[in-house]
Regions:
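Conserved beta-strand in the GNAT
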Residues: 47, 53-70, 77-84
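Conserved acetyl-CoA-binding loop-helix of GNAT-fold acetyltransferases
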Residues: 85, 91-104
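Conserved GNAT acetyl-CoA-binding A-motif
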Residues: 99, 106-119
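A short beta-loop-alpha structural element at the N-terminal edge
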Residues: 1-16
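C-terminal "cap" of GNAT-fold acetyltransferases
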Residues: 119-120, 139-153
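Short loop/turn motifs at secondary-structure junctions and domain boundaries
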Residues: 36-40
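Conserved active-site tyrosine of GNAT-family acetyltransferases
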Residues: 20, 126, 131
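Helix-loop element at the rim of GNAT/NAT acetyltransferase active sites that forms part
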Residues: 18-32
Length: 153
């Protein structure tokens, strides 16, 4: 059974980092020095466990109004990022559950809009969850991305 938790200890944050390293660095070839960034220190980190094994991760960072083109009238923006699911649990709904947990946390924090930069191969996944792509394609760590946003509620 899979459980998603808001990381509440350094060990759980390290578990999130380990999942991200497996997916982004090992599998996708993102340089390790680009995978961890300055946003990690202020983020809410989420970890999905299959028993005791960490199998998914994601984070939420609160950004200023108007972040990456979001409507400034909606206030601060929840920046969903570093969503990663290990290969053995892909296709099980875990990615959807992680996004929903992060969105719920954003709503708890009083945020009305969530933005993310999606790898272009994942655009359909986020569109099915109500996100809308905008702006041109751009490179992030050697992978094509587009910005997406969703108003909560």
């Amino acid at each position: 059974m899979t459980a998603i938790r808001l990381a509440g200890s350094p060990e759980e944050v390290a578990a999130a980092y380990a999942v991200r390293a497996d997916v982004f660095v090992t599998e996708q070839g993102v340089p390790p020095e680009l995978e961890l960034d300055e946003l990690d220190s202020t983020a809410d980190h989420f970890v999905a466990y299959d028993g005791e094994l960490p199998v998914g991760a994601g984070r939420l960072v609160v950004e200023d109004p108007g972040f990456e083109g979001a409507d400034p009238a909606l206030g601060e923006v929840g920046h969903l990022g570093r969503l990663a699911v290990r290969p053995q649990v892909r296709g099980t709904g875990l990615g959807v559950a992680l996004v929903q947990a992060i969105e719920a946390r954003a709503a708890e924090r009083g945020l009305r809009v969530v933005a993310l930069s999606a790898q272009t191969q994942a655009l359909g996944f986020y569109q099915r969850l109500g996100y809308t792509a905008y702006g041109p394609e751009f490179d992030d760590a050697g992978l094509p991305h587009r910005w997406m946003t969703r108003v909560l509620g």
